[in-house]
Amino acid sequence: MLFTLIKRFIEAVLLVLCLFMSGMLGAAAEAASLDYNDERNWAYWQEGKEKAVDCFLICPTVTLGGAGNYNLTLDNRQSGELRAFVGALNMERGIYDASCTMYAPLYRQVSLAVYRLPEKQREPYLKLAYSDVREAFQVYLKQSKKPFVLAGFSQGADMCIRLLKEFGAEPEVAKRLVACYAIGWRITEKELAAYPHLKMAQGAADIGVIVSFNSESPAVDASLMVPAGVKTKAINPLTWRTDNNYASALHNKGACFTDYSANIKKEQPYFCGAWLDAERGTLKINSKITPLAYPPVLDIFTAGVYHLYDYQFFYRNLQENVSLRTGAYWR
């Protein structure tokens, strides 16, 4: 009897110790961040050093997740997810690299599975992703003293906005910021009121501003990026105006569809017209472009949500605008 009690006591103590150690290890794993002073923890580090302006580019979502895997694991540098990470950056880098020295950190971004959770439940995983991005950004600010473009698409845009909320009012950041291209995520009037140092672009060449838009068909009235009842702030990349006037496809200097090696596989000038929706603030694409031809691909989007094509539809306009704003910075 006594032996049995002692045995159960020891088993209970061991169980508590195991749970304690498991929790400690889990917390340590979550808290551990990459050493961004090590160039191996960057997808791009000082690529194109001769440029007068930098670009700090943040990768969009590339991992599907599942089975409780809500943040990208960076342990295996040869994994398919890490190759997709660099590939996704390559798909959009051509917008920026003609004008900028390129920096892009690896980070524990959230997976697509996170966006299937209720919005409040996403935040712990997004905070972990952001903890890496902010650490990388602080290292970048110490390593380079050049002016910079901050850029990101989708989750990358969300991370850009978070960076500006936290650091954008700091004199050094405000002085060095050429513009922030936060494409494919919302930013609302409420956020601008809460962070008055955030300024939306009003034209083609203003400096220190946020460039943002979310593309969708005329029929869409809700999306993951801009839920129903929410109005986002934006600018039309065809005219660089913030009014609701329609801009014809004649303003479109070229849609470019790129691959993971940064090659342009297809280019089409005068691709589409667009206007900013008065109620949603989203960028409505004219009916020449159809959801059948440009499907949402991912099940977190509905037909007519052109999120995956945001920068591809307006590639040449964006590329030209980056050059324009970086030039305007020096004037």
Model-derived features: where do they sit?
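N-terminal secretory signal peptides that target proteins for export/translocation
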Residues: 1-8
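Bacterial N-terminal signal peptides
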Residues: 12-23
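N-terminal low-complexity, Ser/Thr- and acidic-residue-enriched intrinsically disordered segments
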Residues: 28-82
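Active-site catalytic motif of lipid deacylating hydrolases and related acyltransferases
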Residues: 58-147, 290-331
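Surface cap/lid and interfacial helix-loop subdomains adjacent to catalytic sites
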Residues: 129-143, 166-315, 319-328
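Gly/Ala-rich beta-loop-alpha elbow adjacent to hydrolase catalytic centers
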Residues: 152-156
